[in-house]
Curated annotation (Swiss-Prot):
Belongs to the GatC family. Gene3D superfamilies: Glu-tRNAGln amidotransferase C subunit, N-terminal domain. It is an enzyme of class 6 (ligase). This is Aspartyl/glutamyl-tRNA(Asn/Gln) amidotransferase subunit C. InterPro entries: Asp/Glu-ADT_sf_sub_c (IPR036113), GatC (IPR003837). Allows the formation of correctly charged Asn-tRNA(Asn) or Gln-tRNA(Gln) through the transamidation of misacylated Asp-tRNA(Asn) or Glu-tRNA(Gln) in organisms which lack either or both of asparaginyl-tRNA or glutaminyl-tRNA synthetases. The reaction takes place in the presence of glutamine and ATP through an activated phospho-Asp-tRNA(Asn) or phospho-Glu-tRNA(Gln). Its EC number is 6.3.5.-. It catalyses: L-glutamyl-tRNA(Gln) + L-glutamine + ATP + H2O = L-glutaminyl-tRNA(Gln) + L-glutamate + ADP + phosphate + H(+); L-aspartyl-tRNA(Asn) + L-glutamine + ATP + H2O = L-asparaginyl-tRNA(Asn) + L-glutamate + ADP + phosphate + 2 H(+). It comes from the Bacteria.
Amino acid sequence: MITKEEARKIAKLARLKFEKDTVEKFSTQLGTIMDMIDILNEIDCKDIEPLTSVSNMNARMREDAVTSSDLSNKLFDNVSGNSAQLAKEVKYFITPKVVE
């Protein structure tokens, strides 16, 4: 069981601020969590191999190769209207004025 004083100290360390009536609820909930952790600590798992994944599938890795990442030409291919050519040249989107 966590005392109210311990709950206040933990809350302060976690930079949490509680009302006075909430501290009791927090200490009860924190005590319950600590009880659950104690139950987990009692489990004997020394003969169990640790898991890195719940499935036995191996992740397919892509080849680590350098590729071109300049997508600006593809991005500006979608620009339409009178200013499309200028937008492609200066590599900026040209929009109507929104602030006067």
